A protein has these predicted regions:
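Acidic, metal/ion-coordinating pockets
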Residues: 18-174
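Sec-dependent N-terminal signal peptides
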Residues: 4-14
Length: 174
């Protein structure tokens, strides 16, 4: 039976045409330590235009680029480790680089408390970036979990979980 299954997989893989394929790019942590925040500071704002310049081509060429947003967008004061809060301009640079989906359930998702988590989701929604992992309330979780995206005729389901939140309490319902 194993041999038949393997033959099926080989046949199926070889019979796919270009329109039957999708390229998915997964990247690790998108985060901002204090030195990165300080380096991006320009006048009254932050400039991340060059942040992804060496990898933007690869990110934007993928049919779907997915990254782990390992910071909150909790507003000022902006800080790096241990309680991350990145400037909004960082999220704009992530979108401009070509990321389609950000995963938000990780050990830093509550670094700025519930308000920081909610603001992060609000910012993602305002830029129309798909996201999975954290939710403002049980209703939002029920509506958006699991994240289902249709792309190039494919249905992709993304699940995102975390092992913990660095000792910060979570609302188990959301």
């Amino acid at each position: 039976m194993k041999q038949i299954f393997i033959l099926f997989l080989l046949w199926f893989g070889l019979s796919l045409s270009a329109q039957d394929q999708i390229s998915l790019l997964f990247v690790g942590d998108l985060m901002q330590h204090q030195a990165q925040i300080d380096a991006a500071r320009q006048g009254d704002g932050y400039n991340y235009n060059d942040c992804f310049r060496h990898v933007k081509k690869e990110i934007s060429e993928a049919d779907m680029a997915i990254g782990n947003l390992e910071v909150t967008l909790g507003g000022k004061p902006y800080r790096g480790y241990p309680a991350f809060s990145a400037p909004d301009e960082y999220l704009h640079a992530i979108k401009e680089a070509g990321f389609d989906v950000l995963l938000t359930a990780n050990n830093h998702c509550l670094d700025k408390g519930k308000l920081g988590l909610e603001r992060t989701i609000l910012m993602l929604d305002s830029l129309k970036i798909h996201h999975a992992g954290t939710y403002r309330n049980p209703e939002e979780r029920h509506k958006n979990y699991p994240l289902l995206i249709e792309k190039n005729g494919f249905r992709i389901v993304l699940l995102n979980y975390t092992y913990g939140t660095n000792g910060l309490k979570t609302d188990r319902k959301s």
